[in-house]
From Swiss-Prot:
Record keyword Signal present: yes
Annotated signal sequence range: 1-27
Pfam short name (any one): Transglycosylas
Segments of skewed composition (Polar residues): 103-116, 138-153
Induction: Positively regulated by sigma B factor.
Comp. bias regions, Low complexity: 119-137
Subcellular location: Secreted
InterPro entries, alphabetized: Lysozyme-like_dom_sf, RPF
Main enzyme class: hydrolase
Protein name, entry field: Probable transglycosylase SceD
Gene symbol of the encoding locus: sceD
Organism superkingdom: Bacteria
Keyword Secreted in annotation: yes
Amino acid sequence: MKKTLLASSLAVGLGIVAGNAGHEAHASEADLNKASLAQMAQSNDQTLNQKPIEAGAYNYTFDYEGFTYHFESDGTHFAWNYHATGTNGADMSAQAPTTNNVAPSAVQANQVQSQEVEAPQNAQTQQPQASTSNNSQVTATPTESKSSEGSSVNVNAHLKQIAQRESGGNIHAVNPTSGAAGKYQFLQSTWDSVAPAKYKGVSPANAPESVQDAAAVKLYNTGGAGHWVTA
């Protein structure tokens, strides 16, 4: 990504602070966190425009990863800029009146210099996360959470999605609020209408996975997905 930096607005940051001028230091004499200062300058961190990087007078110039950075203060006024190493930097001679209050001040350079800077691409791609929406709490046995294991019934993709939304694929899941149970969270009356005679009156959560799958397929084929709220 490229962006144009204007020396009048971004390459030069000027603030005004109260205080007396101190000693002048150079980058070679100071223990600077160059990486941090470079990152703040590249991102136009407003902290650099609001206050000096340290108290007193200083004059730091250093090169870091293809750019030259300059930070200076006379103890009252402060300024900073950066430019691609090997090119001319922005004019640092701008002055502002002394005041007792800390305040950022915009400075217009005599000659506006523009340069194209290759901005680092730090965008991180976030993978969408599927979330299960279910107002009722479902209790489940942790060891029985995989869908379609131990079942030879051909379950279509939509039913598999319904099972995941309803119970996370847990064949023993039971909803204590509604009484719905099993992999597909059958109500007992619905279960009894599609279950084999052997399992009528038995909780769906106690039926084998293949029996639950077959009952769900039968219900889906005869009445569609409308029996499930999460469908």
